[in-house]
C-alpha cells in the first residue's frame, strides 16, 4: 500500500484568511492519509522573524485546531475503509495502560501516528503479523491476528 503524508504550518507571516481557506480546502479535498499541522513559531534569527504580517499566536493555534478537526474526519473515513482488510503490521510492543499489544502498518510512523491495537499476548515486538482490521477509531484501529512471522530480535522497544 501507499500512504501520502504531509505537514502544514498555520499562521506563517503574511498568511491571510484566503490562504487559510485554501489550506482547509486542501485538507478536505486531498484527504492525506497522514497529516501533521503545527502553528508557526516566531524564532529569533530566522528570516521569517522580522517578516511583516505576523499572525497572532492565538489565531495560528485556532487555525491548527480547525485543520486538525478536518483531518480527524479524513482519518476516521480512512480507518473505516480498512475494516475487514488484512494488513501487515509490525509489532512495536505492549501498552500497559491499554493492556494491548501495539503495532503499526506501512502507513504509520513510530511515535507520531496512530497504532494498531491487538489482543494481549498475541505477538512479540519485532514480529510482522497479518492483522484483520475489526474496528476503526479516529487515530487508531483494532484488529485480530491472521498470521505471524518470527520476531526480529532487538528491533523494537516496549512502550509504557
Describe the role of every protein-language-model region.
Residues 1-46, 66-77:
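Conserved C-terminal portion of the radical SAM core fold
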Residues 50-160:
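Terminal RNA-binding accessory module
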Amino acid at each position: 500500500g501507499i500512504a501520502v503524508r504531509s505537514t502544514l504550518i498555520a499562521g506563517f507571516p503574511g498568511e491571510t484568511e484566503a490562504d487559510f481557506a485554501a489550506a482547509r480546502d486542501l485538507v478536505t479535498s486531498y484527504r492525506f492519509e497522514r497529516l501533521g499541522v503545527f502553528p508557526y513559531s516566531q524564532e529569533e534569527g530566522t528570516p521569517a522573524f522580522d517578516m511583516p504580517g505576523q499572525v497572532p499566536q492565538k489565531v495560528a493555534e485556532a487555525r491548527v485546531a480547525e485543520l486538525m478537526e478536518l483531518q480527524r474526519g479524513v482519518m476516521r473515513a480512512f480507518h473505516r475503509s480498512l475494516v475487514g482488510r488484512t494488513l501487515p503490521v509490525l509489532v512495536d510492543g505492549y501498552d500497559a495502560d491499554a493492556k494491548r499489544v501495539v503495532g503499526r502498518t506501512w502507513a504509520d510512523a513510530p511515535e507520531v501516528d496512530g497504532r494498531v491495537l491487538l489482543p494481549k499476548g498475541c505477538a512479540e515486538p519485532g514480529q510482522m503479523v497479518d492483522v484483520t482490521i475489526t474496528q476503526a477509531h479516529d487515530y487508531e484501529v483494532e484488529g485480530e491476528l491472521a498470521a505471524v512471522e518470527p520476531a526480529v530480535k532487538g528491533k523494537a522497544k516496549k512502550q509504557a
